[in-house]
Amino acid sequence: MASILNRAMLHGGDYNPDQWLSSPDILARDIELMKQAHVNCVSLAIFAWSALEPEEGVYTFDWLQNVIDRLYENGIYTVLATPSGARPAWMAQKYPEVLRVDETLHRNHYGDRHNHCYTSPIYREKVWEMDSRLSKAFGNHPGVILWHISNEYSGACYCPLCQEEFRHFLKEKYKTLDALNAAYWTGFWSHTYTDWSQIEAPVPRGEMLLHGLSVDWHRFVTQRTVDFFNWEKAAVRAGGSELPVTTNLMSFYYDLDYTKFADSLDLVSWDSYPSWRTDPRGDVAVAIHTAMAHDYMRSLKRQPFLLMENTPNQVNWKQINRLKAPGQNLLAAMQAVAHGSNSVQYFQWRQ
């Protein structure tokens, strides 16, 4: 049934029924409301790791099976996510090395979302196990049409493992320290490197003035992130599913080079949250910027894309969060479609 991606406009959004398992009547109510709203697709399990594996090695997929089945019986398809964007507390407690080291070179405590190291062997092992199990369980379900790999990849880790991978990245690029020193012009201020182990990522309390180092670090962060995406994609394939894969990008997110994701994605999707009625430049400028973002997403693979997230009302992270004006939600949806989106999806269905 993956062909629905090519023969229908997807309408729906993120749905997190794992938050409402204590109230089973909510699912029936939500399905009825979805049908009234002509919803034909929802994204599931994006932040559901703790509900899917409440304890290490204890997998509870029954609730997800029930939700996917019930939705499909009512003509609603599932974009199934891998939940790597937010790991459970038990994992951070037992394996603190999965947590990121920030640019002050301190390891983070548990919390937030993208607070995990893409290089950590343990985190990769846990992600592989989860993703491949989800693929085996649901990857060939007739109601599942697309894999939503992780969520809004972002950020960087400065742990010793990532630092060593960065040095390997530089060795692959420059081959010799002489070539690297020449490219970075390290003779200025006597910053010449004499051993690969001396090279560290640019940080506030370390080297910040070698522009070549900073550019290469950002390129490395993109490479690490794409590598992790491909790791998740391989896990899904190992579980037996050949459904297309995507991940939700974030407009002009300058910390990652999205053009490097294009070859790994089967289709592009992104999350659009314009500052309607809030940006001091005015809504015309916001609309122009959003139009350019839509065009950028279409350009990545030179094909239609999916609007994976937007809000029907207002965002909640600005100092001032104004509601959209009457008719503005429809206008934003039509703008996305006009620029090549094959979907209008929202975050989130219930909150």
Report residues per predicted region:
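Short, well-ordered coil/turn segments that N-cap beta-strands
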Residues: 7-11, 38-40, 72-78, 140-145, ...
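Hydrophobic targeting/anchoring helices
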Residues: 109, 246-351
